[in-house]
From Swiss-Prot:
It comes from Corynebacterium efficiens (strain DSM 44549 / YS-314 / AJ 12310 / JCM 11189 / NBRC 100395). It is found in: Cytoplasm. Pathway: Cofactor biosynthesis; coenzyme A biosynthesis; CoA from (R)-pantothenate: step 5/5. PANTHER family: BIFUNCTIONAL COENZYME A SYNTHASE-RELATED, DEPHOSPHO-COA KINASE-RELATED. This is Dephospho-CoA kinase.
Length: 200
Protein backbone atom coordinates (compact mmCIF):
# COMPACT_ATOMS: atom_id res chain seq x y z
CA UNK A 1 0.00 0.00 0.00
CA UNK A 2 1.31 3.44 -0.94
CA UNK A 3 1.50 5.69 2.13
CA UNK A 4 1.16 9.37 1.26
CA UNK A 5 1.94 11.98 3.89
CA UNK A 6 0.05 15.24 3.31
CA UNK A 7 1.19 18.17 5.40
CA UNK A 8 1.46 21.95 5.58
CA UNK A 9 1.44 24.64 8.23
CA UNK A 10 -1.76 25.91 9.81
CA UNK A 11 -3.78 27.82 7.20
CA UNK A 12 -1.91 26.31 4.24
CA UNK A 13 -4.99 24.73 2.62
CA UNK A 14 -3.87 21.18 3.35
CA UNK A 15 -7.44 20.18 4.28
CA UNK A 16 -8.72 21.46 0.93
CA UNK A 17 -6.21 19.20 -0.85
CA UNK A 18 -7.32 16.29 1.37
CA UNK A 19 -10.95 17.00 0.40
CA UNK A 20 -10.02 16.97 -3.31
CA UNK A 21 -8.23 13.61 -2.87
CA UNK A 22 -11.15 12.20 -0.89
CA UNK A 23 -13.56 13.26 -3.66
CA UNK A 24 -11.45 11.13 -6.04
CA UNK A 25 -11.96 8.10 -3.79
CA UNK A 26 -8.67 8.10 -1.87
CA UNK A 27 -8.74 6.98 1.76
CA UNK A 28 -7.86 9.88 4.06
CA UNK A 29 -6.52 9.17 7.53
CA UNK A 30 -7.08 12.53 9.20
CA UNK A 31 -4.82 13.22 12.20
CA UNK A 32 -6.98 16.18 13.32
CA UNK A 33 -10.11 13.97 13.31
CA UNK A 34 -8.22 11.33 15.30
CA UNK A 35 -7.05 14.06 17.69
CA UNK A 36 -10.72 15.05 18.21
CA UNK A 37 -11.80 11.43 18.72
CA UNK A 38 -9.23 10.76 21.45
CA UNK A 39 -10.45 13.70 23.60
CA UNK A 40 -14.13 12.79 23.59
CA UNK A 41 -15.71 12.54 27.07
CA UNK A 42 -14.74 9.26 28.71
CA UNK A 43 -11.44 8.97 26.81
CA UNK A 44 -8.26 8.74 28.95
CA UNK A 45 -6.57 11.63 27.09
CA UNK A 46 -9.31 14.07 28.15
CA UNK A 47 -8.85 13.17 31.83
CA UNK A 48 -5.08 13.69 31.46
CA UNK A 49 -5.58 17.08 29.79
CA UNK A 50 -7.85 18.20 32.65
CA UNK A 51 -5.21 17.07 35.14
CA UNK A 52 -2.50 18.99 33.25
CA UNK A 53 -4.37 22.18 32.31
CA UNK A 54 -7.27 22.43 34.80
CA UNK A 55 -11.04 21.89 34.89
CA UNK A 56 -11.69 25.17 33.06
CA UNK A 57 -10.70 23.54 29.74
CA UNK A 58 -14.06 21.74 29.90
CA UNK A 59 -17.44 22.98 28.71
CA UNK A 60 -20.35 22.66 31.16
CA UNK A 61 -21.42 19.43 29.37
CA UNK A 62 -18.01 17.82 29.99
CA UNK A 63 -16.71 18.17 26.44
CA UNK A 64 -13.37 19.79 25.68
CA UNK A 65 -13.41 23.58 25.31
CA UNK A 66 -10.89 23.85 22.47
CA UNK A 67 -10.31 27.62 22.59
CA UNK A 68 -9.85 27.31 26.37
CA UNK A 69 -7.25 24.58 25.91
CA UNK A 70 -5.52 26.48 23.08
CA UNK A 71 -5.27 29.60 25.26
CA UNK A 72 -3.31 27.58 27.83
CA UNK A 73 -1.43 25.15 25.59
CA UNK A 74 0.07 27.61 23.10
CA UNK A 75 1.41 30.19 25.57
CA UNK A 76 4.86 28.58 25.73
CA UNK A 77 6.84 25.80 24.14
CA UNK A 78 6.75 23.93 27.48
CA UNK A 79 2.94 24.00 27.60
CA UNK A 80 2.70 22.95 23.94
CA UNK A 81 5.11 20.08 24.67
CA UNK A 82 2.91 19.03 27.60
CA UNK A 83 -0.18 18.98 25.36
CA UNK A 84 1.69 16.97 22.72
CA UNK A 85 3.04 14.46 25.27
CA UNK A 86 -0.54 13.61 26.21
CA UNK A 87 -2.17 13.54 22.78
CA UNK A 88 0.53 12.42 20.33
CA UNK A 89 1.15 8.85 21.60
CA UNK A 90 -2.60 8.16 21.41
CA UNK A 91 -2.86 9.73 17.95
CA UNK A 92 0.08 7.56 16.79
CA UNK A 93 -1.56 4.40 18.16
CA UNK A 94 -4.91 5.07 16.48
CA UNK A 95 -3.19 6.09 13.22
CA UNK A 96 -1.23 2.82 13.12
CA UNK A 97 -4.47 0.91 13.70
CA UNK A 98 -6.18 2.70 10.78
CA UNK A 99 -3.24 2.10 8.41
CA UNK A 100 -3.19 -1.59 9.35
CA UNK A 101 -6.96 -1.80 8.78
CA UNK A 102 -6.61 -0.15 5.34
CA UNK A 103 -3.78 -2.47 4.32
CA UNK A 104 -5.72 -5.54 5.49
CA UNK A 105 -8.68 -4.37 3.38
CA UNK A 106 -6.47 -4.25 0.26
CA UNK A 107 -6.43 -0.44 -0.04
CA UNK A 108 -3.86 0.60 -2.68
CA UNK A 109 -3.10 4.09 -1.34
CA UNK A 110 -3.82 5.89 1.93
CA UNK A 111 -3.31 9.61 2.53
CA UNK A 112 -2.20 10.63 6.01
CA UNK A 113 -3.40 14.22 6.51
CA UNK A 114 -1.08 15.33 9.32
CA UNK A 115 -0.07 18.91 10.23
CA UNK A 116 2.95 17.79 12.30
CA UNK A 117 4.18 15.10 9.88
CA UNK A 118 7.66 16.63 9.56
CA UNK A 119 7.78 18.00 13.13
CA UNK A 120 7.36 14.44 14.43
CA UNK A 121 9.71 12.83 11.88
CA UNK A 122 6.81 10.82 10.44
CA UNK A 123 7.68 11.94 6.91
CA UNK A 124 10.32 9.18 6.99
CA UNK A 125 7.58 6.54 7.37
CA UNK A 126 5.80 7.66 4.18
CA UNK A 127 6.38 6.59 0.56
CA UNK A 128 5.46 10.04 -0.77
CA UNK A 129 5.47 13.35 1.13
CA UNK A 130 3.28 16.19 -0.16
CA UNK A 131 3.67 19.66 1.36
CA UNK A 132 1.08 22.40 0.79
CA UNK A 133 2.93 25.71 1.04
CA UNK A 134 1.70 29.27 1.56
CA UNK A 135 3.62 32.37 2.66
CA UNK A 136 3.17 33.09 6.37
CA UNK A 137 1.46 36.48 6.01
CA UNK A 138 -1.08 34.99 3.61
CA UNK A 139 -1.78 32.13 6.04
CA UNK A 140 -2.32 34.65 8.85
CA UNK A 141 -4.65 36.73 6.66
CA UNK A 142 -6.74 33.68 5.70
CA UNK A 143 -7.03 32.36 9.26
CA UNK A 144 -8.02 35.73 10.69
CA UNK A 145 -10.61 36.21 7.92
CA UNK A 146 -12.02 32.67 7.72
CA UNK A 147 -11.75 31.32 11.26
CA UNK A 148 -12.00 34.57 13.18
CA UNK A 149 -8.75 33.89 15.04
CA UNK A 150 -6.63 36.65 16.56
CA UNK A 151 -3.47 37.47 14.59
CA UNK A 152 -1.23 37.00 17.66
CA UNK A 153 -2.77 33.58 18.31
CA UNK A 154 -2.20 32.53 14.68
CA UNK A 155 1.45 33.67 14.73
CA UNK A 156 2.02 31.80 18.02
CA UNK A 157 0.62 28.61 16.48
CA UNK A 158 2.78 29.02 13.37
CA UNK A 159 5.84 29.57 15.60
CA UNK A 160 5.05 26.34 17.48
CA UNK A 161 5.33 24.35 14.24
CA UNK A 162 8.47 23.41 12.32
CA UNK A 163 9.72 26.24 10.01
CA UNK A 164 8.46 26.14 6.41
CA UNK A 165 11.94 25.60 4.96
CA UNK A 166 12.41 22.38 6.96
CA UNK A 167 8.98 21.13 5.89
CA UNK A 168 9.79 21.93 2.24
CA UNK A 169 13.10 19.99 2.44
CA UNK A 170 11.13 16.87 3.40
CA UNK A 171 8.75 17.20 0.42
CA UNK A 172 8.69 14.94 -2.60
CA UNK A 173 5.96 17.14 -4.07
CA UNK A 174 5.21 20.78 -3.17
CA UNK A 175 1.78 22.27 -3.83
CA UNK A 176 1.99 26.07 -3.95
CA UNK A 177 -1.26 27.48 -2.57
CA UNK A 178 -0.42 31.19 -2.68
CA UNK A 179 -2.68 31.67 -5.71
CA UNK A 180 -6.38 31.15 -6.49
CA UNK A 181 -8.24 27.91 -5.72
CA UNK A 182 -8.26 26.94 -9.44
CA UNK A 183 -4.47 26.80 -9.29
CA UNK A 184 -4.69 24.53 -6.23
CA UNK A 185 -7.12 22.22 -8.05
CA UNK A 186 -4.80 21.93 -11.06
CA UNK A 187 -1.89 20.96 -8.80
CA UNK A 188 -4.10 18.46 -6.94
CA UNK A 189 -5.00 16.89 -10.29
CA UNK A 190 -1.29 16.47 -11.09
CA UNK A 191 -0.77 14.89 -7.66
CA UNK A 192 -3.64 12.46 -8.29
CA UNK A 193 -2.10 11.48 -11.64
CA UNK A 194 1.25 10.87 -9.91
CA UNK A 195 -0.38 8.66 -7.23
CA UNK A 196 -2.28 6.66 -9.85
CA UNK A 197 0.96 6.08 -11.79
CA UNK A 198 2.64 4.77 -8.64
CA UNK A 199 -0.12 2.31 -7.68
CA UNK A 200 -0.67 0.79 -11.14
Amino acid sequence: MLRIGLTGGIGSGKSTVADLLSAEGFLIIDADAIARDIVEPGQPALAELVEAFGEDILNPDGTLNRPGLAAKAFVSSEQTALLNSITHPRIAEETARRFAEAEAAGTKAAVYDMPLLVDKGLDRTMDLVVVVDVEEDERVRRLVAKRGLEEDDVRRRIASQVPDEIRLKAADIVIDNNGPVENLRAQADRLIAEILTRIK
